[in-house]
Amino acid sequence: MNDEDYSTIYDTIQNERTYEVPDQPEENESPHYDDVHEYLRPENDLYATQLNTHEYDFVSVYTIKGEETSLASVQSEDRGYLLPDEIYSELQEAHPGEPQEDRGISMEGLYSSTQDQQLCAAELQENGSVMKEDLPSPSSFTIQHSKAFSTTKYSCYSDAEGLEEKEGAHMNPEIYLFVKAGIDGESIGNCPFSQRLFMILWLKGVVFNVTTVDLKRKPADLHNLAPGTHPPFLTFNGDVKTDVNKIEEFLEETLTPEKYPKLAAKHRESNTAGIDIFSKFSAYIKNTKQQNNAALERGLTKALKKLDDYLNTPLPEEIDANTCGEDKGSRRKFLDGDELTLADCNLLPKLHVVKIVAKKYRNYDIPAEMTGLWRYLKNAYARDEFTNTCAADSEIELAYADVAKRLSRS
């Protein structure tokens, strides 16, 4: 996608962007705030976790200034990450022993629709519940609790970059990502746009800090940094950036090979796959009239089926002149191939919300016959970059408690 395409998209969303206040002054040009900077030292707070990727149980162990505590929680019963039995067995046969790799591939730029951003911003509430803080190896994390911000901080170091980053820290950018906090004021809250940026930075393999912001306390320092702006936003070497789409473009243009992988799309169609799902979901979940429910549900199912068709259609590089019959379907893991890309960072957080909320408030399940979509979800839930940036299911459900409307015959 060329610069002219970017400009057109940005012009369209500039006046409607719910998370951004234009012409933000760039304050606090230092890498971070003086009152919390001392907490960034790794020796202060350490974070270690264990994650079973099959059951999605987790145990978090904190060592904070010499005091050790543990937290265990089981979420497998309500996450619903596993596929229907018949699909799961089919996919295991189709993909025996496939490795899960943590690299990005060349893609074109990806942008979510303005409508999705408006709908999501209107629906994300500040209520929720404690999220799992299972940020696992191969990355190492530093946790900080800042009294000034009422936040939790995670410093992420990619294994491949860890030693190099420490030896040449002055040559690397200082990145601080600010995301919405959960109901406890510290864990990661429900916000697909926050998760989108979190995933991008993780996939890039860059060293970065994540600060969860408790909006209920409205910390003064946050207002000074980005007045009138709600998370997500980030600082890059002291410069404040508040527009999610522009942040994505900036990171892709700045964090480049050979050091950082490209994540932009090869196929334009991958960028728009599933683009109308969230708007169909929003209309469905907000509806209060029983007589309209069936039609709105069909609309959501139709949008999901369109995505399923795209995922089952081979990409040009998958087509082999010698293949025939049933083997012509795609077996790729993600939208644009076998690697997570910017397109996935945009779609997967929203798709996860749709899956959780539609089941909770409308008892709606993604149809089992959508094998391409279930394959996509299965592969996504096997990746730490996705599962460990998700809010807890209960957090998402509570965020929509006031949005999902009860059906009535009136």
Swiss-Prot record:
Q: How is its activity regulated?
A: Inhibited by F-actin.
Q: Name one GO cellular component term.
A: chloride channel complex
GO BP terms in the entry:
chloride transport; female pregnancy; sensory perception of sound; visual perception
Q: Which residues cross the membrane?
A: 193-213
Could you tell me one molecular function GO term of this UniProt entry?
A: oxidoreductase activity
The record's EC number reads: 1.8.-.-
Q: Which Pfam families match?
A: CLIC-like_N (PF22441), GST_C_2 (PF13410)
Q: Where is this motif: G-site?
A: 191-194
What PROSITE patterns does the database record attribute to this sequence?
GST_CTER
What is known about the tissue distribution of this protein? Widely expressed in both fetal and adult human tissues. Isoform 1 is expressed in renal glomeruli endothelial cells and podocytes (at protein level).
Q: GST C-terminal domain: from which residue to which, for each copy?
A: 260-400
Keyword Cell division included in the entry's annotation: no
Q: Which leading EC class covers this enzyme?
A: oxidoreductase
| Keyword terms | Cell membrane, Cell projection, Chloride, Chloride channel, Cytoplasm, Cytoskeleton, Deafness, Golgi apparatus, Hearing, Ion channel, Ion transport, Membrane, Mitochondrion, Non-syndromic deafness, Oxidoreductase, Sensory transduction, Transmembrane, Transmembrane helix, Transport, Vision, Voltage-gated channel
Name the family the entry cites. Answer: Belongs to the chloride channel CLIC family.
Question: What disease has this protein been linked to?
Answer: Deafness, autosomal recessive, 103: A form of sensorineural deafness with onset in early childhood. Hearing impairment progresses from mild to severe or even profound before the second decade, and is accompanied by vestibular areflexia.
What the protein does comes down to:
In the soluble state, catalyzes glutaredoxin-like thiol disulfide exchange reactions with reduced glutathione as electron donor. Can insert into membranes and form non-selective ion channels almost equally permeable to Na(+), K(+) and Cl(-). Required for normal hearing. It is necessary for the formation of stereocilia in the inner ear and normal development of the organ of Corti. May play a role in the regulation of transepithelial ion absorption and secretion. Is required for the development and/or maintenance of the proper glomerular endothelial cell and podocyte architecture.
Q: What is known of its domains?
A: The active G-site contains a monothiol Cys-X-X-Ser motif which mediates glutathione-dependent redox catalysis. Members of this family may change from a globular, soluble state to a state where the N-terminal domain is inserted into the membrane and functions as a chloride channel. The redox status of the active cysteine in Cys-X-X-Cys/Ser motif likely determines the capacity to adopt a soluble or membrane-inserted state. A conformation change of the N-terminal domain is thought to expose hydrophobic surfaces that trigger membrane insertion.
Q: Partners and quaternary state?
A: Component of a multimeric complex consisting of several cytoskeletal proteins, including actin, ezrin, alpha-actinin, gelsolin, and IQGAP1. Interacts with AKAP9. Interacts with TPRN. TPRN, CLIC5 and PTPQR form concentric rings at the base of stereocilia and may form a complex. Interacts with EZR, MYO6 and RDX; the proteins may work together as a complex to stabilize linkages between the plasma membrane and subjacent actin cytoskeleton at the stereocilium base.
What is the name attached to this protein's record? Chloride intracellular channel protein 5
Which species does this protein come from? Homo sapiens (Human)
